Amino acid sequence: MLGSVKMEAHDLAEWSYYPEAGEVYSPVTPVPTMAPLNSYMTLNPLSSPYPPGGLPASPLPTGPLAPPAPTAPLGPTFPGLGASTGGGSSSGYGGPGPGLVHGKEMPKGYRRPLAHAKPPYSYISLITMAIQQAPGKMLTLSEIYQWIMDLFPYYRENQQRWQNSIRHSLSFNDCFVKVARSPDKPGKGSYWALHPSSGNMFENGCYLRRQKRFKLEEKVKKGGGGSSASRNSAGSASTATAPAATVASTPQPQPPPPEPEAQGGDEVGALDCGSPAAPSTPYFTGLELPGELKLDAPYNFNHPFSINNLMSEQSPAPPKLDVGFGGYGAEGGEPGVYYQGLYSRSLLNAS
């Protein structure tokens, strides 16, 4: 009896364990694991551009593809799939990821190199640099354009805009004067040169900023530039060896003789290069080019923003300082005897 009772008790224990078989089958069956897979597969057609009709049929034949997918941390690692995987998840979630990375790289590709940056010089400075670097100290308009484009690659674009500004600067500034072509140099367009009294616009060869704006009216009112700026005939070349303040003579006779201190101002007034209706022509003829446009002896000044530092590798040879204007100089006289130079020292470092 006791054995039968024990057996019954054992049987009861086993039967009491069998009703809990549902709990045993629940982890074995892949039904709970398929639920997140189905949810993951249903999310793909929402974000991917493919039609939703073909995607439900695609996971059915690809049965063996399910084992690599059931990674337990699918939920937490799901937002990182777009950034971590560049090729697999780029169809659905990789669109904004590479766009953000590409957006960060965009500014690097559009940075303008330093060689093509806009130079910190005004148009008057560019024209002055071009004329000063010319061997004859005068250039045509097309030669000024070409010099600027060769030295600064920035001006190789939008040529019509800045070339108009160059023309306006040449026309509306008294520091630039037109030089007529001589018969021995035929061609199109007149030459442009610097006014003899405009040598103090820039300081020590630095073209970043002008000291003051050059105007002929101010020179006439002040009446003292310390040097002569008049144009003499070829017969007065013999008296040009004296200082400029004593050898200056007026091109037109005047009834009252000018005072010594006001003599320079009257002579500057004779150079009315801006008024086309003035009796004195605004063009320098072949024999009347002033000698002040010639450079003096070079000095060892090396400004960091000087044009010579920019042109050190591009200029093949320094300009000849003793040539002046070549064929435009005085006849039968020494090259440096015609007039005394205005500049106490040259604006450019010819070394």
UniProtKB/Swiss-Prot annotation:
Residues 52-73 have a biased composition (Pro residues). Residues 83-94 have a biased composition (Gly residues). It holds the Pfam family Forkhead. PROSITE patterns: FORK_HEAD_1, FORK_HEAD_2, FORK_HEAD_3. Keywords: Activator, DNA-binding, Nucleus, Transcription, Transcription regulation. GO terms for biological process: anatomical structure morphogenesis; cell differentiation; cellular response to starvation; hematopoietic stem cell homeostasis; intracellular glucose homeostasis; positive regulation of transcription by RNA polymerase II; regulation of transcription by RNA polymerase II; spermatogenesis. Its main location: nucleus. It comes from the Eukaryota. Residues 52-94, 218-275 are annotated as: Disordered. One of its GO terms (cellular component) is nucleoplasm. Residues 228-251 have a biased composition (Low complexity). Residues 118-212 bind DNA. It is found in: Nucleus. SUPFAM superfamilies: Winged helix' DNA-binding domain. The keyword 4Fe-4S does not apply. GO terms for molecular function: DNA-binding transcription factor activity, RNA polymerase II-specific; protein domain specific binding; RNA polymerase II cis-regulatory region sequence-specific DNA binding. Transcription activator for a number of liver genes such as AFP, albumin, tyrosine aminotransferase, PEPCK, etc. Interacts with the cis-acting regulatory regions of these genes. This is Hepatocyte nuclear factor 3-gamma. It comes from Bos taurus.
